[in-house]
């Protein structure tokens, strides 16, 4: 594969961490070069580090408008970083090794398993091939559909490039766009009622956020829902609910002064995009604080494990809900679809939830204190970073050095995963053969 995968003294978590960090630093250096900016000058390192982190961590928060600041070379660098970040650094490395005919060792297969949240090492190479074919098919289909609109509006070959760029950006849940030539940082607001743009980008976001294991499950079992793994069922149902319920709220309680068609399309899209994509067709600054809070919650929850999406993952949220229901019903275990949740799964979910909440809250408070901005605005920005979403209420470009570093840290944390970061930096405790005595404490 790549050299760092041969370091046997590194754990899988450390390899994943090092891989993402290496790609981010390389991307930052390339974006610094005068050839990357339209002005032909060097771009400050902290700004390119921010942009590279945002691209690799498929976030979409930007300090410069992508269409007007970066040259074609810079845009290609950003798109490459997005594709690597969306697929995962280890998956890309494995794909290169497979295509070059190199043999993948057992330890490398184990790292690949951890990187894509696969249930077992067996069949991991075949599964990686399935991922590559699926990504190619989905992104090419998305590019073809979007090019119909963009070639009409921007001509050829500019429209074709925009179709490719936005297809990859949407599928990888990145949120970078090239539509700022007329109005900088406008995202997809010019296409709020365009059915091709809304449906194509919306479904690319959803497909990317479902996870590759879910793809494989659906392809293998077709429409026989009862045959799916419990994880796939939970992901599909929670995804549907986390899109439908917010969409209904947005339609009936937000954007009430807009025409029906704009409100209908906008409500649906604004409930899809917080699943870590970062595109918007309506301005989130026009939402009430309740709407912004709901969006922040959706951003922190994110998409599915083993997907192009970030966040703490909808399965984590679903496990916490199941455990709460079990407590209310005085049952010993949480369960879904006739299957009991394991104790280890519950412990992992609680740890992940606490990690993400602590990072999200601390980041928002630091930005609010340093920038002297309203807390809800800073929490929105923090949720966007830790959930690797890219939505903003318009403060990103005006942030100072400390706030940029906070967001860079949150984006990196949100993409590699809280537990991966912990496992990579903190040595594991020794497993004792004996267990300590148990004693109950009162809670609640």
Question: What residue ranges belong to the model's regions?
Answer:
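Membrane-proximal intracellular helices of multi-pass ion channels
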Residues: 1-444
């Amino acid at each position: 594969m790549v050299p760092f995968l041969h370091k046997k003294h590194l754990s899988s978590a450390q390899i994943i961490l090092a891989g993402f960090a290496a790609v981010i630093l390389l991307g930052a250096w390339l974006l610094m070069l005068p050839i990357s900016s339209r002005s032909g000058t060097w771009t400050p390192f902290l700004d390119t580090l921010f942009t590279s982190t945002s691209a690799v961590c498929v976030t979409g928060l930007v300090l410069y408008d992508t269409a007007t600041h970066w040259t074609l070379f810079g845009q290609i660098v950003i798109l490459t970083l997005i594709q690597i970040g969306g697929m995962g650094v280890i998956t890309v490395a494995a794909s290169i090794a497979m295509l070059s005919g190199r043999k993948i060792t057992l330890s490398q297969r184990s790292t690949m398993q951890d990187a894509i949240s696969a249930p077992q090492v067996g069949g991991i190479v075949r599964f990686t091939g399935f991922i590559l074919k699926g990504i190619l098919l989905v992104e090419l289909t998305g590019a073809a559909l979007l090019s119909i609109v963009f070639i009409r509006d921007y001509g050829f070959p500019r429209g074709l490039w925009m179709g490719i760029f936005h297809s990859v950006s949407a599928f990888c849940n990145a949120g970078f766009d090239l539509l700022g030539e007329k109005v900088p940082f406008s995202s997809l607001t010019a296409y709020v009622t365009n059915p091709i743009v809304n449906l194509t980008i919306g479904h690319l976001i959803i497909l990317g956020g479902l996870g590759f294991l879910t793809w494989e499950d659906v392809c293998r079992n077709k429409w026989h829902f009862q045959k799916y793994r419990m994880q796939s069922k939970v992901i599909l149902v929670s995804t549907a609910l986390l899109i439908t319920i917010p969409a209904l709220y947005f339609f009936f309680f937000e954007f009430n002064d807009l025409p029906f068609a704009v409100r209908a399309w906008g409500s649906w899209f604004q409930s899809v995009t917080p699943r870590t994509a970062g595109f918007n067709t309506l301005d989130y600054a026009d939402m009430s604080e309740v709407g912004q809070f709901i969006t922040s919650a959706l951003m922190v929850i994110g998409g599915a494990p083993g997907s192009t999406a970030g966040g703490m993952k909808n399965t984590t949220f679903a496990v916490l809900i199941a455990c709460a229901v079990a407590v209310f019903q005085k049952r010993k275990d949480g369960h879904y679809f006739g299957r009991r949740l394991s104790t280890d799964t519950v412990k992992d979910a609680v740890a992940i939830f606490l990690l993400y909440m602590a990072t999200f809250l601390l980041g928002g408070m630091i930005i609010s204190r340093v920038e002297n901005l309203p807390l809800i605005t800073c929490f929105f920005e923090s949720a966007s970073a830790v959930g690797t979403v890219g939505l903003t209420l318009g403060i990103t470009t005006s942030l100072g050095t400390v706030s940029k570093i906070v967001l860079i840290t949150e984006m990196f944390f949100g993409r590699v995963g809280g537990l991966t970061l912990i496992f990579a930096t903190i040595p594991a405790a020794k497993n004792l053969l004996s267990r300590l005595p148990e004693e109950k404490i009162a809670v609640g």
